[in-house]
């Protein structure tokens, strides 16, 4: 299931254990059905050793992997708190760590404005683009912000989390217009930026700021992430880079 969370949110520990035992039966049944695939106990499940203790999991089957859902640059904290391997600090020994729900917000599927619910209830979009979050604003403002924060998050996670086993970013309903019509579906800007950010061989600049001033010194660390499928090494290379003004 998706984000049941009773192992965290149910204040009655004994009742939470009974619920977990029900899911454990499903895990064991799935191992019989297909023993070749790793199992995630629950979407967004991270083994709660602090609550139940390590000894509890010596005899309890809670699957094979941990799955950390996060909304960095959206609900959660800024991407600048993901530059030093913070994501992989949630890794438990012997258990691969993934995220199958990494998201940075929701353009709607028609105009590209942020989805109305988030504008009026959570108010996340206003933090990024102010009044342009509303229906009378320019949708390109939000699409550009969404493109930028999605790509920078993907690169930050790849730069600093070699112990992580994979990140799945929200894509279909957030990177495309008209997703319900194969004849008119059209990529939003985030799609094109993520082509680069998720390329097998990534060259990424770690920038601790978003405001750059003429004449100032720009401290920057360049990282090369090599996920080439054939496992080949990257030969000695030279990075050529420049700053380009959109205005």
Protein language model regions, located:
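Short glycine/serine/proline-enriched coil/turn segments at secondary-structure junctions
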Residues: 75, 89, 213-214, 231-233
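Beta-strand-rich binding/interaction modules
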Residues: 215-247
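Localized sequence-composition bias
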Residues: 175, 184, 190, 242-246
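Short beta-strand segments of immunoglobulin-like
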Residues: 207-212
């Amino acid at each position: 299931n998706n984000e049941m969370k009773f192992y965290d949110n149910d204040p009655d520990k004994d009742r939470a254990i009974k619920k977990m035992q029900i899911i454990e039966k499903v895990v064991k049944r799935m191992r019989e059905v297909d023993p070749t695939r790793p199992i995630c106990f629950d979407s967004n499940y991270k083994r709660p050793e602090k609550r139940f203790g390590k000894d509890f999991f010596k005899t309890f089957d809670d699957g094979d992997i941990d799955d950390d859902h996060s909304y960095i640059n959206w609900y959660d904290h800024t991407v600048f708190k993901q530059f030093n391997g913070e994501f992989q600090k949630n890794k438990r020994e012997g258990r691969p760590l993934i995220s199958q729900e990494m998201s940075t917000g929701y353009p709607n599927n028609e105009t590209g404005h942020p989805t109305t619910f988030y504008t009026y209830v959570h108010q996340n979009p206003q933090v990024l683009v102010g009044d342009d979050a509303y229906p009378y604003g320019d949708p390109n403002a939000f699409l550009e912000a969404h493109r930028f924060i999605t790509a920078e998050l993907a690169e930050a996670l790849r730069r600093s989390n070699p112990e992580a086993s994979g990140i799945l970013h929200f894509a279909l309903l957030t990177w495309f217009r008209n997703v319900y019509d194969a004849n008119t579906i059209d990529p939003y800007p985030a799609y094109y930026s993520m082509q680069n950010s998720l390329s097998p061989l990534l060259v990424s600049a770690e920038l601790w700021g978003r405001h750059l001033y003429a004449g100032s010194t720009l401290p920057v660390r360049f990282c090369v992430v090599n996920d080439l499928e054939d496992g080949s090494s990257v030969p000695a290379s030279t990075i050529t880079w420049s700053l380009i003004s959109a205005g």
